[in-house]
Amino acid sequence: MTWDSFGVASRELATSVADSGYEPDIILAIARGGLLAAGALGYALAVKNLYTMNVEFYTGVDERLPVPMILPPVPDLVELRFARVLIVDDVADTGHTLKIVEDFFRGRVKEVRSAVLYEKSHSVVQCQYVWKHTDLWINFPWS
C-alpha cells in the first residue's frame, strides 16, 4: 500500500460506512495499526470523538503471542454505554485482535461495528466495512 492508495482506501471505506446509514458516536482505533485509518475516517465521517485501545498480538513479521492482550488504559464503559462504536484497524489478519476488542464492547455499548482496510479469508471475524480482501502480506507505508 502506498500513501496515495491509503487516501483512496480511507475515502472509499468512509463512503461505505456513510452509505450504510451507520452513524458512529465514536471511532475507536486499535493501536498502532488502526491509528491513521481511524483518524482519516474521523475526518471523513465528521466524528470528533476518537478513542484508542492498545492490543498486543504481533511481535514481528508473522510472529505473534498465543492470544492478543488488551493493554491499559481502556475506555470507560460507563461513559460509553449509549454510544455507537466503530472499531478501526488496518487489517483483519487472524481477526483475533478485532475479536477481543469487539467482545470487550459487545453488550456494553449501544452498537459496535468494525472497519478495516484489508481483511484476510482466514479471519475469525467478518468486518462490516472492508476496503479490500487479500491473503497476501501487506506492507503499509507507516510500518
Predicted regions and their residues:
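PRPP-associated nucleotide enzymes
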Residues: 1-143
